[in-house]
């Protein structure tokens, strides 16, 4: 799973491995 946008911060991706909050 990858976080590519700010809206990902509020999805399961936010807590997924490889999706640090630094991406938000």
UniProtKB/Swiss-Prot annotation:
It is found in: Secreted. One of its GO terms (cellular component) is extracellular region. Disulfide bonds join 3-24. It comes from the Eukaryota. Keywords: Disulfide bond, Ion channel impairing toxin, Potassium channel impairing toxin, Secreted, Toxin. Expressed by the venom gland. The keyword Ligase does not apply. Belongs to the short scorpion toxin superfamily. Potassium channel inhibitor family. Alpha-KTx 06 subfamily. Has the structural arrangement of an alpha-helix connected to antiparallel beta-sheets by disulfide bonds (CS-alpha/beta). This is Potassium channel toxin alpha-KTx 6 OcyKTx5.
């Amino acid at each position: 799973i990858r976080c590519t946008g700010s809206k990902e911060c509020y999805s399961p991706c936010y807590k997924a491995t490889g999706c640090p909050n630094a991406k938000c």
